Amino acid sequence: VNLASPDWMLAGFDSTGEIFQFAQVSRQTYQQSSFLDHRIQPMPERLVSASGAEVDGVLTGCESKPAGYIFHSAFCTSTLLSFCLDHQPKTLVLREPMVLSRLASHNRGLASADGALPALLRQRVLGLLERSYAAESVIIKPSNIANALIPGILQTAPGQPAQRRCVLLSCSLYNLLVSILKKTDEARGLLPRFLAALLKDSNYLQRVQLPSLESLDLLQQSAVFWHCQRYLFNTIRAEFGAQQVLPLSMEFFLREPLQALTAINDFLGLGLGVSELETTVTEGAFLQHAKAGTRYAPQQRQEEAEQVARRYGREIESTLAWMQPTLRNIPVEPLDVAENLLT
């Protein structure tokens, strides 16, 4: 078993943070899986464990460079973006590895008991996720439920140059509400749990006066969910600056995909060629449904959004109006010139 290879994907760790579980996968598994959790394709059949000391030995022998990260809010084409950047053998993309969600949950539990996530555990997890095949650049797109880990991932030791860089991807509140209405069943299943986790990770409720979450309807919960994440993104941008953070709106990505992909390629140092990115946009991943794998052109996406907006216009406008006092109290900084937060 060669744990220096990404063929042994980090799958988890025990409560002590000293035993790590690995699942045997292939390069194809990474390329075709929209999620590296229970939805991984195909499901791994072989698992092995290693101690923290063994992991340290593996990482000492690895020469992988720091990964680039895509942190995102919900329903903002992050999966589509990740597939557009997936170019074997130049890049290796990890989409929503379960172990980072597990690390965030572990961090949440420690924080509730006035503890802190051990730096060594975080270093081991990130080091194992950043293993690569040959000279591939690694891109990691965590689930947004792990966004509280962003400061720890980006932080740099005193006196050391900045290491990790990230893209912060989100969308306008208006477009989030449209997406929620397109995927109501999925949203109802995920949103309460995700929102509760995000609020635990943040001092948001100390800044914002809200009625009980149970009294809010789905769109109001969605608006709070969006604002809580954008509140965090404001903080991340202020703390780490343009050297480590590239802000990007879904609106700009969909409107100017080649320009957006080129900016990410340059910022993360992925080494992708202009022709590769052009092909991605004109006949590749950009024209496919990121999760279904079927053809899904931008025009179809736009038409569906317009249909939802026409059908639920009153509900959307009501939610935007309800959120206005909160936005005045804690403004959200647009990610780029394409993002109009309320339209």
Summary of predicted features, one role per range:
Residues 1-127:
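PAPS-dependent sulfotransferase catalytic core
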Residues 1-60, 208-219, 230-247, 254-343:
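PAPS-dependent sulfotransferases, especially Golgi type II membrane carbohydrate sulfotransferases
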Residues 68-75, 139-143, 219, 223, ...:
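Short, charged/polar micro-motifs that form catalytic or ligand-binding hotspots
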Residues 69-71, 83-86, 92-96, 139-141, ...:
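A structural signal for short, well-ordered beta-strand segments and their strand-loop junctions
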Residues 99-113, 147-244, 249-274:
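PAPS-dependent sulfotransferase catalytic domain
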Residues 124-133, 231-237:
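CE4/NodB-like, metal-dependent polysaccharide N-deacetylase domain
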Residues 130-137, 241-246:
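Short, surface-exposed connector motifs at secondary-structure boundaries
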Residues 132-152:
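Glycine-rich phosphate-binding loop used to anchor ATP phosphates in small-molecule kinases
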